[in-house]
A protein has these predicted regions:
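Acidic-aromatic/histidine active-site loop/patch
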Residues: 219
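A conserved regulatory-domain signal marking ACT and ACT-like small-molecule sensing domains
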Residues: 237-404
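Glycine-rich beta-alpha junction loops
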Residues: 43, 175-177, 222-226, 230-235, ...
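Short hydrophobic alpha-helical runs that function as membrane-insertion/retention elements
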Residues: 168-172, 226-228, 290
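Conserved dinucleotide-binding and phosphotransfer motif residues
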Residues: 32, 88, 222, 285, ...
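Nucleotide/pyrophosphate-binding catalytic subdomain
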Residues: 1-216, 307, 383-384, 399, ...
């Protein structure tokens, strides 16, 4: 039988009635002729609640024990869903990440999937069961439970779909698909029928919370189509794939990310090796750096700015401040009140005018640009955090995305 992997987010399984609703959707897919493997997230705000509880017990929870704790959220959801399916007369079984054969590295809270042994899942499918897999987790070589980081259930689902040779991975959530902008910010935003892996990866990396970037990367590498749709209705969703789509000479979507902090090292001596030392030390500390800008040198002195997530700002300062003193820089300054706004679209390649329209629109709205970064299909600006929603609305109108 053809196989499909469903993934349901925390909102979709947020209470008993929603779990029963998901069970009915799974049964419909099974009745339509598909074998079904399901990946679930933890119910509602369970993960956040467990993190808060851990920090109430101790200010420094063990990374290993925190992973074990957080993995229980998905176990609860998967077992309840299996119970609901059995209550509706269908054979089903819940599996932890370890039982489903998901092997990871040992990097607690940010583990990466190294391999999947699908033998147990295939065996259960062969016995006619619907298989429910707890997302977001796996097991390391030392047999410790690991978690994949926030949004990791998406990665679990796509990785399982690839390893099982599924025809598609379908991600069901509380939105109907991928939009030209966040519809909560821009009511005129339009749902896209399809989007390329490249565009979706940029969207996911630069602010869209609908798909996790690592899941999109996996889909792109292995050519696994991913459908994003609502678990609350049967409306058509958005297909993420690598097919030959019509090249539109326009922006596809606009996204914003308010989880941005900028670190500036003022008065850096302009000599070889300093940037390597700074960013090498940040990498060793586990700090992920995004935009990097170095000013032109004046009399052998320059300023170096880079962005990190707000949660990493303190750690980044702790790394660079001693280095700044060591190299004779004047000071380190942090700004945690910023946001990234991006325009994204494959139609932007080799076509002039997009940057000019973007910058003119922001200027007309009195929005100051602090930093700029680009790729072949993206232009991103760093602006004041409180102006992000205003910038997205203005750019959505400027590029006429309401006509999509």
């Amino acid at each position: 039988m053809p196989l499909v992997v469903h993934k349901y987010g925390g909102t979709s399984v947020g209470d008993a009635e929603r779990i029963r609703n998901v069970a009915r959707r799974i049964i419909a897919a099974k009745d339509a002729g598909d074998d079904v493997v399901v990946v679930v997230s933890a119910m509602g705000d369970t993960t956040d609640d467990l993190i808060k509880l851990a920090y109430q017990v101790t200010d420094t929870p063990s990374a290993r024990e925190l992973d074990v704790l957080l993995s229980t959220g998905e176990l609860v959801a998967s077992t309840l869903l299996a119970m609901a399916l059995k209550g509706m007369g269908h054979e089903a079984i819940s599996l932890s990440g370890a039982q489903a054969g998901i092997r990871t590295d040992s990097n607690h809270s940010k583990a990466r999937i190294m391999a999947i042994d699908p033998a147990r899942v295939k065996s259960e499918l062969g016995a006619g069961r619907i298989v429910i897999v707890a997302g977001f987790q796996g097991i390391a070589q030392d047999s410790d439970v690991t978690t994949l980081g926030r949004g990791g259930s998406d990665t679990t689902a796509v990785a399982l779909a690839v390893s099982l040779g599924a025809r598609a991975c379908e991600r069901y959530t509380d939105v109907e698909g991928i939009y030209t902008a966040d519809p909560r910010q821009v009511p005129e935003a339009c749902k896209l029928k399809e989007i390329s892996y490249d565009e979706m990866l940029e969207l996911a990396t630069y602010g869209s919370k609908v798909m996790h970037p690592r899941a999109v990367e996996l889909g792109q590498i292995y050519g696994m189509p991913i459908l994003v749709a609502s678990s609350f209705n049967d409306n058509r969703g958005t297909l993420i794939h690598g097919g030959h789509m019509e090249i539109r000479n326009k922006v596809t979507a606009i996204t914003a990310d308010t989880d941005v902090a900028k670190i500036t090292i003022v008065g850096v001596p302009d000599r070889p090796g300093i940037a390597a030392g700074i960013f090498g030390s940040l990498a060793k500390a586990g700090v992920s750096v995004d935009t990097i800008v170095q000013n032109a040198s004046i009399q052998g002195i320059t300023d170096l700015s880079f962005t990190v997530s707000k949660g990493d700002a303190g750690k980044a300062l702790g790394v660079v401040e001693p280095l700044a003193q060591e190299i004779g820089a004047r000071e380190c300054v942090a700004d945690t009140s910023l946001s990234k706004v991006s325009i994204i679209g494959t139609g932007m390649q080799n076509t002039p005018g997009y940057a000019a329209t973007m910058f003119d629109t922001l200027f007309a709205g009195g929005i100051n640009i602090q930093l700029i970064t680009t790729s072949e299909i993206r232009i991103t600006v760093i602006i004041a955090g409180e102006q992000a929603a205003e910038a997205v609305k203005a750019l959505h109108k400027a590029f006429e995305l309401e006509k999509e």
